[in-house]
UniProtKB/Swiss-Prot annotation:
This is Ankyrin repeat protein OPG025. Plays a role in the inhibition of host immune repsonse by counteracting the action of interferons on early events in the viral replication cycle. InterPro entries: Ank_repeat_dom-contain_49 (IPR051637), Ankyrin_rpt (IPR002110), Ankyrin_rpt-contain_sf (IPR036770), Pumilio_RNA-bd_rpt (IPR001313). GO terms for molecular function: molecular adaptor activity; RNA binding. Induction: Expressed in the early phase of the viral replicative cycle. Belongs to the orthopoxvirus OPG025 family. PROSITE patterns: ANK_REP_REGION, ANK_REPEAT. It comes from Vaccinia virus (strain Western Reserve).
Length: 634
């Protein structure tokens, strides 16, 4: 027993050689003796022992016929500074456990974290079949199959066909910490050299190792992030087949490093390699993510293709930021006012008034070209969501002088106004109508603006229905044509089954009270059961016809005169007094009258503000000044 403890203590303190060990064993010391759960061999083989002697190890093993071989902690041994490959070979030949996991990693991964691992040791261990990634996981991919039922014909081009979606394992998408990963991330420690030979061997042993990702990033990403970078190491880890998304993540991380580490200099060789032959989509997404003009300019300076084409693609397919446009202009791109605005609108979601304003103010005009190049197509802005309503309204106000056709229709015959009605955008509907949108357009399916308003107001919950009713009043108060009215009446009469809600009578009354202003006889003939209601409406109509300014009644002012001519009436006390009235049925007309008064006041204020002494505008007759501003703003 005494010799057992002496042998253990000598091994524990590393104060032993083969001769003394042999003597103690011959004196009866037992190499299998345990103290605190440790045998002498287990106590001796530790990373704290900087001088593990092979002959001592072999003696402790052979004296008991290698029964204690797994007391030799191979994880501890691989962390020591004096690994003997012949000893490793012997241990492996004698059956030492090499496939175990300790603290979540295997022995090859553990060895990769040491300060100066040897290629021969890697080769010995990997040739024994130890995995290069002890905890590999796989991604998934979506499998899409079209459902075809027996006896049914399906058009494969029909967007309404049914599809079955399933998730399958993607064995090409490998995820986990590899030997290469462990080797790279530990190189940033003091005294830990980065060996090109080690990297080349590991990659040659398993080429796919470069494609493994941990937290969605490759080993190259971590190398550029943590280590002092050498081109030859970069080249060994780099693969042009990495996804464009990952390459841009690597480049972003590399460029940002200059703000994290002092004296870090950008190597243009690395920037060029990461940018070379990359899909511009990823490059532009990277520019958006950086939000730093210095970094964006660094990328653009190394971009070898056309910056002009890059700008066009940017405004066409990406969320646009003004600072990125400015950087492109600084690198030689030319911003065109209408060309780039029209491209900007083509991407769904591009609805930033600040971007539109910047392009309008700073974009160049195309000279000596077709007039269409100097107009803006606003159709791609629609349909819009209510959450973006104010943004779209701001954009429309900015683009107003350049809109090519406010009544442009799509392939279904739907106008911009029609789309805004469907999305219950009250402010957009009002602005469009005030600026010339045609309320009488009929779609290919026979809908009028009035029709869709009535149907949707009848279908939706009260909160939304109120918006459609308000829009209906706005449209009708502009008085549709008799052709539009007849189309609406015919459609609603043919599709009575659509009206199952409780709003249908009140909705029809709203229509009728304006229809009679257009064609009284026709309306009465179509809605004879509403004669009593029509009679009540006539009383308010008569009141509007009785109030006159120089022989012109209020209905004529509101509906028969053009905008500049109306300006002569709106400041008249008779008109302003009438605009203060409260009608039961026609308050929308009163609302329109007050809006005219408000707009007229704005024009008067603007004229006064800009009419300075000796100003050219101030020399014009007041009526001419009113006419100019009326056409521009009323």
């Amino acid at each position: 027993m005494v010799n057992d403890k002496i042998l253990y203590d000598s091994c524990k303190t590393f104060n032993i050689d083969a001769s003394s060990a042999q003597s103690l064993i011959e004196s009866g010391a037992n190499p299998l003796y345990e103290y605190d759960g440790e045998t002498p061999l287990k106590a001796y083989v530790t990373k704290k022992n900087n001088n593990i002697k092979n002959d001592v190890v072999i003696l402790l093993l052979s004296s008991v016929d290698y029964k204690n071989i797994n007391d030799f902690d191979i994880f501890e041994y691989l962390c020591s500074d004096n690994i003997d490959i012949d000893l490793l070979k012997l241990l492996i030949s004698k059956g030492i456990e090499i496939n175990s996991i300790k603290n979540g990693i295997n022995i090859v991964e553990k060895y990769a974290t040491t300060s100066n691992p040897n290629v021969d040791v890697f080769k010995l261990l990997l040739d024994k079949g130890i995995p290069t990634c002890s905890n590999i996981q796989y991604g998934y991919k979506i499998k899409i199959e079209q459902i075809r039922r027996a006896g049914e014909y399906y058009n494969w081009d029909d967007e309404l066909d049914d599809y079955d979606y399933d998730y399958t394992t993607d064995y090409d998408d490998r995820m986990g910490k590899t030997v290469l990963y462990y080797y790279i991330i530990t190189r940033s420690q003091d005294g830990y050299a980065t060996s090109l030979d080690v990297i080349n061997y590991l990659i040659s042993h398993k080429k796919e190792m470069r494609y493994y990702t941990y937290r969605e990033h490759t080993t190259l990403y971590y190398y550029l992030d943590k280590c002092d970078i050498k081109r030859e190491i970069f080249d060994a880890l780099f693969d042009s087949n990495y996804s464009g998304h990952e390459l841009m993540n690597i480049l972003s991380n590399y460029l940002r490093k200059q703000f994290r580490k002092k004296n870090h200099k950008i190597d243009n060789y690395i920037v060029d390699q990461l940018l070379f032959d990359r899909d511009t989509f990823y490059i532009l997404e990277l520019c958006n993510s950086l939000r730093n003009n210095i970094l964006i300019s660094t990328i653009l300076k190394r971009y070898t293709d056309s910056i002009q084409d890059l700008l066009l693609e940017y405004v066409s397919y990406h969320t646009v930021y003004i600072n990125v446009i400015k950087c492109m202009i600084d690198e030689g791109a030319t911003l065109y006012r209408f060309k780039h605005i029209n491209k900007y609108f083509q991407k769904f979601g591009n609805r930033d008034p600040k971007v539109v304003e910047y392009i309008l103010k700073n974009g160049n005009l195309v000279v000596d070209n077709d007039n269409d190049d100097n107009l803006i197509n606003i159709m791609p802005l629609f349909p819009t969501f209510s959450m973006r309503e104010l943004d779209v309204l701001s954009i429309l106000k900015l683009c107003k002088p350049y809109i090519d056709d406010i009544n442009k229709i799509d392939k279904h015959g739907c106008s911009i106004l029609y789309h805004c009605i469907k999305s219950h955008s009250v402010s957009l509907v009002e602005w469009l109508i005030d600026n010339g949108a045609d309320i009488n357009i009929i779609t290919k399916y026979g809908f009028t603006c009035i029709t869709i308003c009535v149907i949707l107001a009848d279908k939706y919950i009260p909160e939304i229905a109120e918006l459609y009713i308000k829009i209906l009043e706005i449209i009708l108060s502009k008085l549709p044509t008799i052709e539009c009215i007849k189309k609406t009446v015919d459609y609603l009469d043919d599709h009575r089954y659509l009206f199952i809600g409780g709003n249908n009578k009140s909705l029809l009354k709203i229509c009728i009270k304006y229809f009679i202003l257009v064609d009284y006889k026709y309306t009465c003939s179509m809605y004879p059961s509403y004669i009593e209601f029509i009679t009540d409406c006539e009383k308010e109509i008569a009141d509007m016809r009785q109030i006159k300014i120089n022989g012109t009644d209020m209905l004529t002012v509101m509906y028969m005169l053009n905008k500049p001519t109306k300006k002569r009436y709106v400041n008249n006390p008779i008109f302003t007094d009438w605009a203060n009235k409260q009608y039961k049925f026609y308050n929308q007309i009163i609302y329109n009258a007050n809006k005219l008064i408000e707009q007229s006041k704005k024009i008067d204020d603007m004229i006064e503000e800009v009419s300075i002494d000796d100003n050219r505008l101030s020399t014009l007759p007041l009526e001419i000044r009113h006419l100019i501003f009326s056409y521009a703003f009323l």
